[in-house]
Each structure stands twice: as C-alpha cells, then as structure tokens.
C-alpha cells in the first residue's frame, strides 16, 4: 500500500492494454521507408498457403486457414469461415481482426464476399457474415 507522500511524488500509472490484432495497427510508409502507427479495421493481403489445422483438445475437426502476407508486409495466420471456399495461393483477401478460440495462433479472420474470397453458397440465415447474396425466389 502506497503512502500519501509516495503518491504525491509519483501518481499511479494506468495499465496499458495490448492490442489483440497487432498487424492491423500499423502500415508501411513508402516515402519514409518505415512502419507508421495507424489502426485499420481491415487490411488487404495475398494468400501464401491455404491448408487445414486440427483444433485444441475437446474439439475435433479440420479447420481451414490461410497464411497471408498483408499490405504492410507482415505475415499472419487467418481463419477461413463458412462451409467451402475457393481460395488458393496468390488469392487477394481482406483480413479483419478476431481470434478463433480453439486454434492457437490464429488471431485474424478472412472476410467472405470481398475480393477473391467468394461468399458461402446456399446460405439462408446469417448471410451478411459470410458474404452471401439474397437467393432469388421461385415463382
């Protein structure tokens, strides 16, 4: 416990929280040739490798993910949500923050329906999260 005189000399410092998606918080300045701090909601990237991974202990599946080089030069591992995808090496994708709880080291999601990542086919509910268009009604 601090005394009053100790607190007068030096006040309590507030804890600084670490960002959960650090690769989205900076960009490469071409003119100055160095990284500059500015946050982005999403960043564009190119797929380097598209493969599968098994989740942590109680769960069992083959989760699809991609290794992506972002526009700021950093490489991240991003999850591909939804059933089925058409991504392959050199595909352009949009990456947003958001971790996958049962995949260690995966802190980003690929946005479906943007750039080369097509929307999920035959999806009726929760379409906006998977980039699906409203299906045509039959007469």
Curated annotation (Swiss-Prot):
GO biological processes: translation
Record keywords, A-Z: Methylation, Ribonucleoprotein, Ribosomal protein, RNA-binding, rRNA-binding, tRNA-binding
Gene Ontology terms: cellular component: small ribosomal subunit
Record flagged with keyword GTP-binding: no
Region of interest called Disordered, as start-end residue ranges on this chain: 1-21
Any Pfam family hit: Ribosom_S12_S23
GO terms, molecular function: rRNA binding; structural constituent of ribosome; tRNA binding
Subunit-structure text: Part of the 30S ribosomal subunit. Contacts proteins S8 and S17. May interact with IF1 in the 30S initiation complex.
Listed name of the protein: Small ribosomal subunit protein uS12
Protein source organism: Aster yellows witches'-broom phytoplasma (strain AYWB)
